[in-house]
Structures are given as structure tokens and as C-alpha cells.
From Swiss-Prot:
It comes from Staphylococcus epidermidis (strain ATCC 12228 / FDA PCI 1200). The keyword Repeat applies. The keyword DNA repair does not apply. This is Chaperone protein ClpB. One of its GO terms (molecular function) is ATP hydrolysis activity. Keywords: ATP-binding, Chaperone, Coiled coil, Cytoplasm, Nucleotide-binding, Repeat, Stress response. Residues 85-145 are annotated as: Repeat 2.
Length: 869
């Protein structure tokens, strides 16, 4: 027997049989060892055929094991197990060779071994029984008229079932979600499929717009017989390219698998339509030196009309792969799939609603579907409808489902309190003093009350869970009845269809409504229930906020108070600039209330004024107030953009330049944090061409980066600071700190001389910051000293400065042209440095108070008050 005349699967089985011989200490390879090995081969054809014939393969393997354990064993140091083939095994292989010749094959394959085993092995005969003819029919069907001409023939057997899935069959089994809309694209696809030649549509559209759904919709129409007569008997197979490539170890194996698939499609004489998702992957697939890629293998069949093929790919990949191969491109007919609008998306979500309700066991409100479509369209800008809206609904349902599976917060708190009291009770029982006994009595009373409350809550939760389970059961029953109705209508079983449509389904709908109403009456409104089972627009808003960081969920009371007092919070940090603070806080309130222009940033401001008056501080304060951290501020120092070419750093380097893959500093920061404060500091230091980039941001709220991606700035606050006109402000400010009209005009003239009108015209407001007065300085002193006290808090030391000393600090450090910065330096010299020396010189105990006062010589005195022990 020549081992080279066997397929790889049979050779592998023989090698495994040697291992089994060693396991059972047998010198010969017995027939049972070979057959057991044939069963346990990867993707075993031997096992697959027996399973189809309804033979219990696990019991058969046990029977082989039992038989092997009865053979005489050989033991010793130099025994080579499985070195020889037994007479029975030899007889089986001879018989298999005869079957090979009768099938006109070139190699002994697994089906020959199976036929030989049925003829020669008693154990196999006993288990197969009277199913020999059934097995013969299965073998004929599996081979599909193919001959074994290679050592890997299994790839040619039932190739479509191995490397594809039948979409029409999945629709019949109710495994597919309904497809809503897309009628025009489906009709277009049907027209192209009905052509004589080049009847191959390719669906082109952005990721997530529903290309695959169009093919699923066509499969559903075929099942419903809602297609032209020429397509009624068709079936759609989706080709799994990854399965086609996976495990193709030898050169030419991939091509062999693809040829087997194409052969089956061709032999179906147009009955099979092949759907290839991500069709661009075929171009270059399997390409090695001197080999042909998969795309070239398809071309002849596509041109002759022997292969009905539907492709799907994205616009970018079509351009990159398919358009480059013009011979392949001309064999396909393009069908554009555009993104549906919000109204169409809402219709799609309404069609899918029931499926998601049954799957998650929740109830989805209609306003949740509307919110999912609208919020995803507005805030999730880097993905496409309807995919992103469906994802939102799915995530919200999963969130509610997770909550339903765990204890409600109220019950969880009571459980923890009961456990805490029980631990305390067991500890107090060991004490004998009166105080402990008295506490034990109080505790036992409290524990009794808590346990009663726990029992009541548990009972409520169980009742609600029971009711929800009943509602879920009815929903699932109704869904399966509707699927059965579709099947009955498709099969033409009118009696069953009538019974379902006019009897079963209305009855189930009535029962479901009664259950839901009873549940509503018993448990009250949704807000009063222990367990939430309703998905509302609030849950959708929460998910959008999680994904994007943009607060779109309903305002909670604490946030309302925070927004209404935003102006006061900012006033505490920014001294003397009331107009600027009010303008910025008003813009935030408008945005959070949802009445701002949805196509522009929340606000865009240009802050003008001398150095050190609070322009940058206001931007920091705003970021800190909105996000509880200054880190959410995107700060760009425009002094770094003095050259003309530096604009590429904002939006990313052009293709071909170093750093193209890294993206721009501004665009990447906003893509990661779409809800943020953007501070463009010292804008007059930048090159004038840099401002051209800002035009689209200020007007349309978007910017296209170097990779062609549109970045959304609609949820940002843009603040620019500049010192233009600061000299005019310093020279002409009134005593009360007010800015006169003439001064304002002079500053604006300076501004117009530097900035182009189209930039200034797009800004919401230009705010003039007035120079700080002496009164402002005393307030800033308070702020600086508060910050110092916060830093000393870790060391449990505090300072107290008298009003006289504070006034002196403010007056001495007052320099109008430099703002508040000199004051900071003055406080460092006059207060921080002496305190630091005192702390190093003598160790100050915790609780020490350092009192600072002004003496007669106009110098600061420091008095250390140590805590009394």
C-alpha cells in the first residue's frame, strides 16, 4: 500500500492510529485504532457522514475503545508500538483501494475508508445497521459529482456550505432582523441581477449605512415572493472570505477552495447568487509569486454571466482596490447607498424595536428611538446612520437589562445595613457591661425594623421580577407567532396563516396589553418601581454622554444650580471683569438649555486687554467650573505658530510630509474631547495665514484635517486672547475703571488693522478687559492668600493676614501696565519666603497659626501662635 496514494486526511488518521496503538500497548495498527483516528481528524468527513445518518458517533468511538482494550498487549523496553499494520487493517485498506478505483478517483479518501469499514469491520456494521443505503446517498451528495484528483479533496466537498451561509434559509428560520426602507436600492439591485450579462451589482457606501442590510432585504423579499419571477427560485449565499483563506497551508489550496465554490455556483445554473461582503479583499487575495489572485479568477465568469455576484464595499476601498483594476470594475454595476436621514432612521428603529424588546426583555419608548436618531446624528459625527443610532438603542437596552439582573439600590443599601448590624450584634453579645447591654437592646430593635424593611423590599422586587418575566414571555410568544405566520404565508398554508392572523396573534396581543396594564396598576408609574424595565430618552442621552463626553442628558438638580450660579463661580476667580464673565456664562447656559445654534460653536470670543488682567484665567476658570478640571482645556500657544507653514501643525501635515499619520494638534485634541474649552493664547503672535483655518470653525463649527476627516467643533467654546490695543486702554481708562467710547473705538481700530474683517465678523463677541484698579488688587490678595492657605493645609499650618497688611500688599504691588502678576511675585517675596524660612529653621507643630500684620515702619511682622497642648 503506497502512502502517497492516500489523501492528507487518511495519512493523518494513520499517524493518529500509531499514537492510539502506543496508548493501548499494541504492536500492530488495528482497524479500530484507524477508524477511531478517522473519527477524530479535524473537520472529519468520516464523522460528518455518520452524524448525518443519525448514528451516535460518541457511542461508536466508545465501542472502538472497548474493542481495542481486548487486544493482547506487548510490553518491554525496546517495543515499537504501531510498527506494523494488522491483517484486518490491511484488508480494510485493500477494500478502500477498490472503492477508489470504482469511484474513478486518484487517491484513497475518507469516504473510501468508510465504505470499506462498513464492508469489513463488525463493530461498524453493528452500529450502521440498515443505514448503508442512506450513507451511500450522503456520500454521493457530499461529493457532488467531483472526483478525488488531489490529496486534499475535502475542500471541494460542499464548498458553499463550508465557506458561506445561506441568507434565504436564515430568513426562513427567523434569524434575521427585519429590513425597513431601502426600497429604491433593493429595486436597483433586482434590475441589475435581471440583466443577461454583467448582472453583478456592487453596493458602495460609507460604513454603517446599511449595505449588508440591502442584501438581507433582498433575501427577505425572495422568501416573501416579492420579487420578479426570474428571482423567485434564487438563493443568496454570503461568502466568508476569512474561512476561505484560513488554514490554506499549501500553495494553491486557497485557489482550489475558491474554484470549488465557483464551480458549485456555476453548476447551480444561476440559482445561487453569491454575496461577497468587503469585496475589495478579493483583489490581491491568494496572490503569491506567479500565482493568480482571486479577483482575476472571478473575471471570466463575471463577464460571461455564469456568476451572479453582489459585492459590498466602502467608497474609499472601492477607489483604492476595485477602480485600480478597470477590467474587474467594468464587470460590476455600481449601486450607491447613501446615509439615511433622521426620519428614515427613526422608521428603521421602529421596525427593529420589537426584536430588541424581545431579546433584552425590556420596553422601549418611542421617544427613546427618536432621541437615538437625533442625538446620534448631532453628536456622534465620525460614524453613520442608522448604525450609530441602532448601537445607541442596543447599548441602552443592555444597560437596563444589566440593572434588572441586579438588586435595586434601595434593597442593596438595606442588605448592607442589616449585615453591618448583625456583625455589631454578635460582637456586643460577648460584652457584659450595662452600656453594651443597653446598646444591644437598641441595636436589636433597629435590626428588627431593618429586617422587616428588607423582607418587604425583597417581596416587592420578587413580585416585580415575576410580572416582568410574564410580560417578556408573552412578548417572545407573540414574536414567534408572527414568525410562524410569515412561514405559513410563504409555504401557502392558508389555514394555519388564518388561524394565526385572526386567532392566536390578536389573542396574544390582548393578553400582553392586559399584563402590561395590570403591571402598571400594581406597581404604579415607572418612577415608583423598584426595577426599571423601560428604555427612555434619558438612557439614550446618558449613553451619548458616556461615548462623547458631551452633556446631553437631562439636567439634574445639582447641575441646574451649578449652571445658574456659573457667573458667581467665575466672578470669585476672575476679579474686575464683569462683562467678560457674564458673556461667557450666558453662552454656556444657552448651550446647555439646548437653544443655541446647532451649527456653530457654543461661543467664540476675542479677549483684548493688557497683560495680567485675567484673560487666560477666565478660560481656565470656565474649564474648571464646567469639567471640575483645567485639564479639559485645549490650550494652544499661538506664539508657536509664527511661521506661515506652522498652520499644518494645527490640522496635520499634508500627505507625503513627515508626521502625516499623527494628525493635527487642534483637530486630534477636539476629536478626543469634543466638549471642551479651546484657548488660543496670544493670537497676535501667530502668522496671519493661521487665522484662515479658523474661518470654518467660527462659522460652520467644523474643520477638515489633513486626512480629509471632518472634525466637529459645535460643542466647543473658543476663546482667543490678545494684547492688541492694551497701550490705548492703559493710557485712557477712567478713574472708575470704565472704558470710554473713544478708547473702545481706538482699540477696535488697532484690531481691524491687524485682523481681517472676515475673522472679526464671525466672532460672537469682542470683549475689552479693563486694567485692574487698586480695589481689585485687594480682592486678588485675598485670592492669592486663600491659595497659599490651601497649600499649607497638608502641613496643618495656616496664616492669618490683617486687613491693613492686605491693603498694603495691594497698594505696594500695584502696577497698572502689568496687571496682577507683579502682586503674585510681591506676595512670594514678602510672605511666602519668610514663612518658608521659619518652617525650615524651626519645626512648626500641627495646628500652628502664623499671624501677619503691618508695623509702624510699613513692614510685615510675623507672629507664630503654637497650639496649646
Amino acid at each position: 500500500m503506497d502512502i502517497n496514494q492516500m489523501t492528507y486526511a487518511v495519512q493523518g488518521a494513520l499517524q493518529k492510529a500509531v499514537a492510539y496503538s502506543k496508548e493501548y500497548e499494541l504492536q500492530n495498527i488495528e482497524v479500530e485504532a484507524l477508524l477511531k483516528a478517522a473519527m477524530n481528524e479535524n473537520d472529519s468527513l468520516f464523522k460528518s457522514i455518520l452524524e448525518r445518518a443519525n448514528i451516535d458517533v460518541d457511542q461508536l468511538i466508545k465501542a472502538y475503545d472497548n474493542q481495542l482494550s481486548h487486544y493482547p498487549t506487548v510490553q518491554g523496553d525496546n517495543v515499537q508500538y504501531g510498527q506494523y499494520i494488522s491483517a484486518k487493517t490491511n484488508e480494510l485498506l485493500d477494500k478502500a483501494e477498490k472503492y477508489m478505483k470504482s469511484y474513478e478517483d486518484e487517491f484513497i479518501s475518507m469516504e473510501h475508508i468508510l465504505r470499506a469499514a462498513i464492508d469489513t469491520d463488525e463493530t461498524t456494521q453493528k452500529w450502521v445497521g440498515n443505514k448503508v443505503e442512506v450513507i451511500k446517498e450522503i456520500i454521493t451528495k457530499v461529493r457532488g459529482g467531483n472526483h478525488v484528483t488531489s490529496q486534499n479533496p475535502e475542500v471541494n466537498y460542499e464548498a458553499l456550505e463550508k465557506y458561506g451561509r445561506d441568507l434565504v434559509e436564515e430568513v426562513r428560520q427567523g434569524k434575521m432582523d427585519p429590513v425597513i426602507g431601502r426600497d429604491e436600492e433593493i429595486r436597483n439591485t433586482i434590475r441589475i441581477l435581471s440583466r443577461k450579462t454583467k448582472n453583478n451589482p456592487v453596493l458602495i457606501g460609507e460604513p454603517g449605512v446599511g449595505k449588508t442590510a440591502i442584501v438581507e432585504g433582498l433575501a427577505q423579499r425572495i422568501v416573501r415572493k416579492d420579487v420578479p419571477e426570474s428571482l423567485l427560485d434564487k438563493t443568496i449565499f454570503e461568502l466568508d472570505l476569512s474561512a476561505l483563506v484560513a488554514g490554506a497551508k499549501y500553495r494553491g489550496e486557497f485557489e482550489e477552495r475558491l474554484k470549488a465554490v465557483l464551480k458549485e455556483v456555476k453548476e447551480s445554473e444561476g440559482r445561487i447568487i453569491l454575496f461577497i461582503d468587503e469585496i475589495h479583499m478579493l483583489v490581491g487575495a491568494g496572490k503569491t509569486d506567479g500565482a493568480m489572485d482571486a479577483g482575476n479568477m472571478l473575471k471570466p465568469m463575471l463577464a460571461r454571466g455564469e456568476l451572479h455576484c453582489i459585492g459590498a464595499t466602502t467608497l474609499n476601498e472601492y477607489r483604492e482596490y476595485i477602480e485600480k483594476d478597470s477590467a474587474l470594475e467594468r464587470r460590476f454595476q455600481k449601486v450607491g447607498v447613501s446615509e439615511p436621514d433622521v426620519e428614515d432612521t427613526i422608521s428603521i428603529l421602529r421596525g427593529l424595536k420589537e426584536r430588541y424588546e424581545v431579546y433584552h426583555g425590556v420596553r422601549i419608548q418611542d421617544r427613546a428611538l427618536v432621541a437615538a436618531a437625533e442625538l446620534s446624528d448631532r453628536y456622534i459625527t465620525d460614524r453613520f446612520l442608522p448604525d450609530k443610532a441602532i448601537d445607541l438603542v442596543d447599548q441602552a437596552c443592555a444597560t437596563i437589562r444589566t440593572e434588572m439582573g441586579s438588586n435595586p439600590t434601595e434593597l442593596d443599601q438595606v442588605n448592607r445595613r442589616v449585615m453591618q448590624l448583625e456583625i455589631e450584634e454578635s460582637a456586643l453579645k460577648n460584652e457584659s457591661d450595662n452600656a453594651s447591654k443597653h446598646r444591644l437592646e437598641e441595636l436589636q430593635e433597629e435590626l428588627s425594623n431593618e429586617k422587616e424593611k428588607q423582607s418587604s423590599l425583597k417581596s416587592r422586587v420578587e413580585q416585580e421580577k415575576e410580572k416582568i418575566a410574564k410580560v417578556q414571555e408573552k412578548r417572545a410568544e407573540l414574536d414567534s407567532s408572527r414568525q410562524a405566520l410569515e412561514d405559513a404565508q410563504t409555504e401557502g398554508n392558508l389555514e394555519k396563516a388564518a388561524e394565526l392572523q385572526y386567532g392566536t396573534i390578536p389573542q396574544l396581543e390582548k393578553e400582553l396589553q392586559e399584563f402590561e396594564e395590570a403591571f402598571q396598576d400594581e406597581t404604579g408609574e415607572d418612577s415608583e418601581r423598584m426595577i426599571r424595565e423601560v428604555v427612555s430618552d434619558e438612557e439614550i442621552g446618558d449613553i451619548v454622554s458616556q461615548w462623547t463626553g458631551i452633556p446631553v442628558s437631562k439636567l439634574v438638580e445639582t447641575e441646574r444650580e451649578k449652571l445658574l450660579s456659573l457667573s458667581d463661580i467665575l466672578h470669585k476667580r476672575v476679579v474686575g471683569q464683569d462683562k467678560a464673565v457674564d458673556l461667557v456664562s450666558d453662552a454656556v447656559v444657552r448651550a446647555r438649555a439646548g437653544i443655541k445654534d446647532p451649527n456653530r460653536p457654543i461661543g467664540s470670543f476675542l479677549f483684548l486687554g493688557p497683560t495680567g488682567v485675567g484673560k487666560t484665567e477666565l478660560a481656565k476658570s470656565l474649564a474648571s467650573s464646567l469639567f471640575d478640571s483645567e485639564k479639559h482645556m485645549i490650550r494652544i500657544d499661538m506664539s508657536e505658530y509664527m511661521e506661515k507653514h506652522a498652520v499644518s501643525r494645527l490640522i496635520g501635515a499634508p500627505p507625503g510630509y513627515v508626521g502625516h499619520d499623527e494628525g493635527g494638534q487642534l483637530t486630534e485634541a477636539v476629536r478626543r474631547n469634543p466638549y471642551s474649552v479651546i484657548l488660543l493664547d496670544e493670537v497676535e503672535k501667530a502668522h496671519s495665514d493661521v487665522f484662515n483655518v479658523l474661518l470654518q470653525i467660527l462659522d460652520e463649527g467644523r474643520l477638515t484635517d489633513s486626512k480629509g476627516r471632518s472634525v466637529d467643533f459645535k460643542n466647543t467654546i473658543i476663546i482667543m486672547t490678545s494684547n492688541i490695543g492694551s497701550q490705548v486702554l492703559l493710557e485712557n481708562v477712567k478713574d472708575a475703571g470704565e472704558i470710554s467710547d473713544d478708547t473702545e473705538k481706538a482699540v477696535m481700530d488697532s484690531l481691524h488693522a491687524y485682523f481681517k474683517p472676515e475673522i472679526l465678523n464671525r466672532m460672537d463677541d469682542i470683549v475689552l478687559f479693563k486694567p485692574l484698579s487698586v480695589n481689585d488688587m485687594s480682592m486678588i490678595v485675598d485670592k492669592i492668600l486663600t491659595q497659599l492657605n490651601m497649600r499649607l493645609l497638608d502641613q496643618h499650618i495656616s496664616i492669618e493676614v490683617t486687613e491693613e497688611a492686605k491693603k498694603w500688599l495691594g497698594e505696594e504691588a500695584y502696577e497698572p501696565q502689568f496687571g496682577a502678576r507683579p502682586l503674585k511675585r510681591f506676595v512670594q517675596r514678602q510672605i511666602e519666603t519668610p514663612i518658608a524660612r521659619m518652617m525650615i529653621k524651626e519645626s512648626l507643630p500641627e495646628g500652628t497659626i502664623i499671624k501677619v500684620d503691618l508695623n509702624d515702619n510699613k513692614e510685615l511682622d510675623f507672629k507664630v501662635v503654637k497650639p496649646t497642648s
